[in-house]
Structures are given as structure tokens and as C-alpha cells.
């Protein structure tokens, strides 16, 4: 607990002093005003707390797995079907929490596309097992946008043990998610979030890499497909090699249909078979060198 910093509450009385696990998320001024992380506050006495109104709109759903497909070597796209007649009233950039029961999964049972199995074998990951004795809760950003109704779509990267140290624990939730198959039942709750677009005419610059694609896709699709925004916007995405890129056709289509949108990919480790003649390096450096360095007013952009 205490790693994501999303469960902020205002504690007006009780709760004790702020813990070291909270100090990375809460500064001294906020702590003085009573800001705490709910997951770190032990209830040992009567307390007075204040939570945001939107928390009371949180619901729980039992969903069914539609598909759980590889999009990159270590990234899956999990699609969940919301129960008939119900909806998750989320905003682009929002997230849900997903529950994993106690489980024992073997990586050798994962459904991994043939084109990616070589890397899994090379690192010995098919020998990994994940054994979890308690329920687990984790937050994931939606990759779909509000008009893609009836589903929740997530981009999930597997948290494997480091190569050569396979005795270390694997990611509890990502291992569970990678084990899911069509028809399985999954419990989620939400919606949550604060990473929402501001309603201005300012230029938008989206930056992401790997499974960080999820909120970027949600935002960009929402701006261009639902809101039909005319704001200038660009998406800068970083991947290791060409095989780690995904949703290219979607973004190429958006760029072709919207003069105000461009997207750029930089590969940090292009392979010989990629025949890559595009941008290379880490995406934050590429963004600065290729665009922001000569931008007339980068401080006016929304990132």
C-alpha cells in the first residue's frame, strides 16, 4: 500500500501522524492541512474525515472477459464486458480498480502469441509461477473512451521477476490478468480519476510509452472522435522496437482524418529487421529535441 497515492482524504481529527510511506505523495503543507492516504491510516479511534463527492458514485461490477490479446511482447489488451444494461460513467483519462482473488498461476499456461514466445523462452519466463494467498487490488487506466460503451479496455504490462532472478516474486495483479481467458469473470470498481483534460483551446501534447498508451488512447480518441476538437495536438510515443508498437493503424487513421493531430514514434532499441529510419532514443529527449526546444511557448501547452 501507499505506492499509487490516489486514495487521498482529509483527516480532520484522529488517525495519528503521517507515515513515511505517505511522505512521497504528500508535502508538508498538505500534511499540515490533514491530507492523508486512506490506505495508510489505521482506524483505532473515532475519526472525522472528508472525501471527494465523486467517491460516493463509485460502483462495483462483475464483468466477463471478451478477449485478452498480446499487443506487444509483454503487454496485453484486456477487454471486459460490462453487465447488460449497465455502464461505467467514466471520463477519458480515468481509471478503475480490478480485484484479483488468491491464486496460483503458471506462466507456462499463459496464451502468448507465437511471435512473442521467443523472448519469453529466452528469459525463462515460462518457468515462473505466481502464488498469492490474499485478495489483491490494483488500479489501471482505461484505454477505451466514453463512447466505446459496454466495455472496459486495459493495457497491462506483465511485471516479471528480473531476468536471472526468477526466484523473486512476480507481479501479483499482472500475473493474474495475463492468466485470464475469454469467459472468465472479473470484478472491477470505479470510476476514479483526476487525469482529465482541461476545457481550453491550448495545444495538447501527449507523451507515453509502453502500457502508458492506455490513458493516451482514451484522451486522444475522446478529443477527436467524441468532442471533434480542433485543438492542435500531438502524441509522442516511445517503444523499444517496431515489434513493441501497437495501435498504429488507429493513430494513422486519426492523423489522416484530423489536420490538427500528428503522432510520432521513437524507438529506443530498433532491431536490424525493423529497417527503421524514423526517430530513435528515449521519447522525452526526442520530444524536446524535435519539437519543444524550438516551440514558441511550450509553457502554454497542456501535457
UniProtKB/Swiss-Prot annotation:
GO terms for molecular function: 2 iron, 2 sulfur cluster binding; metal ion binding; oxidoreductase activity, acting on NAD(P)H, quinone or similar compound as acceptor. It is found in: Cell inner membrane. Its EC number is 7.2.1.1. The keyword Transferase does not apply. Residues 1-45 form the 2Fe-2S ferredoxin-type domain. Binds 1 [2Fe-2S] cluster. It comes from the Bacteria. NQR complex catalyzes the reduction of ubiquinone-1 to ubiquinol by two successive reactions, coupled with the transport of Na(+) ions from the cytoplasm to the periplasm. The first step is catalyzed by NqrF, which accepts electrons from NADH and reduces ubiquinone-1 to ubisemiquinone by a one-electron transfer pathway. GO terms for cellular component: plasma membrane. Keywords: 2Fe-2S, Cell inner membrane, Cell membrane, FAD, Flavoprotein, Ion transport, Iron, Iron-sulfur, Membrane, Metal-binding, NAD, Sodium, Sodium transport, Translocase, Transport, Ubiquinone. [2Fe-2S] cluster binds at residues 4, 7, 39. This is Na(+)-translocating NADH-quinone reductase subunit F. Its cofactor is [2Fe-2S] cluster; FAD. Signal peptide: none annotated. It holds the Pfam family FAD_binding_6. Belongs to the NqrF family. Composed of six subunits; NqrA, NqrB, NqrC, NqrD, NqrE and NqrF. One of its GO terms (biological process) is sodium ion transport. It catalyses: a ubiquinone + n Na(+)(in) + NADH + H(+) = a ubiquinol + n Na(+)(out) + NAD(+). Residues 58-198 form the FAD-binding FR-type domain. It comes from Colwellia maris. InterPro entries: 2Fe-2S_ferredoxin-like_sf (IPR036010), 2Fe-2S_ferredoxin-type (IPR001041), Beta-grasp_dom_sf (IPR012675), Cbr1-like_FAD-bd_dom (IPR008333), FAD-bd_FR_type (IPR017927), FNR_nucleotide-bd (IPR039261), NqrF (IPR010205), OxRdtase_FAD/NAD-bd (IPR001433). Residues 201-303 are annotated as: Catalytic.
Amino acid at each position: 500500500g501507499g505506492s499509487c497515492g490516489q486514495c487521498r482524504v482529509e483527516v480532520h481529527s484522529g488517525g495519528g501522524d503521517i507515515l513515511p510511506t505517505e511522505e512521497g505523495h504528500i508535502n508538508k503543507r498538505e500534511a499540515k492541512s490533514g491530507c492523508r492516504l486512506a490506505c495508510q491510516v489505521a482506524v483505532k479511534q473515532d475519526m472525522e474525515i472528508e472525501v471527494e463527492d465523486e467517491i460516493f458514485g463509485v460502483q462495483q461490477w462483475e464483468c466477463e472477459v471478451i478477449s485478452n490479446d498480446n499487443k506487444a511482447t509483454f503487454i496485453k489488451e484486456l477487454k471486459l464486458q460490462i453487465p447488460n444494461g449497465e455502464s461505467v460513467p467514466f471520463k477519458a483519462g480515468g481509471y478503475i480498480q480490478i480485484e484479483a482473488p488468491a491464486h496460483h498461476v503458471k506462466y507456462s499456461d499463459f496464451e502468448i502469441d507465437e511471435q512473442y514466445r521467443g523472448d519469453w523462452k529466452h528469459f525463462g519466463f515460462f518457468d515462473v509461477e505466481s502464488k498469492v494467498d490474499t485478495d489483491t487490488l490494483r488500479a489501471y487506466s482505461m484505454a477505451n473512451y466514453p463512447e466505446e460503451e459496454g466495455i472496459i479496455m486495459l493495457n497491462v504490462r506483465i511485471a516479471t521477476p528480473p531476468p536471472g532472478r526468477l526466484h523473486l516474486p512476480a507481479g501479483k495483479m499482472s500475473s493474474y490478468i495475463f492468466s485470464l481467458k475469454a469467459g472468465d469473470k472479473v470484478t472491477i470498481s470505479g470510476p476514479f480519476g483526476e487525469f482529465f483534460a482541461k476545457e481550453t483551446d491550448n495545444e495538447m501534447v501527449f507523451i507515453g510509452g509502453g502500457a502508458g498508451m492506455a490513458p493516451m488512447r482514451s484522451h486522444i480518441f475522446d478529443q477527436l472522435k467524441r468532442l471533434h476538437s480542433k485543438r492542435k495536438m500531438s502524441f509522442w510515443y516511445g517503444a523499444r522496437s517496431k515489434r513493441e508498437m501497437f495501435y498504429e493503424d488507429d493513430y494513422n487513421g486519426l492523423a489522416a482524418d484530423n489536420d490538427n493531430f500528428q503522432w510520432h514514434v521513437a524507438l529506443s532499441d530498433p532491431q536490424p529487421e525493423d529497417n527503421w529510419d524514423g526517430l530513435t532514443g528515449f521519447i522525452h529527449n526526442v520530444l524536446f529535441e524535435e519539437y519543444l526546444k524550438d516551440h514558441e511557448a511550450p509553457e502554454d501547452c497542456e501535457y
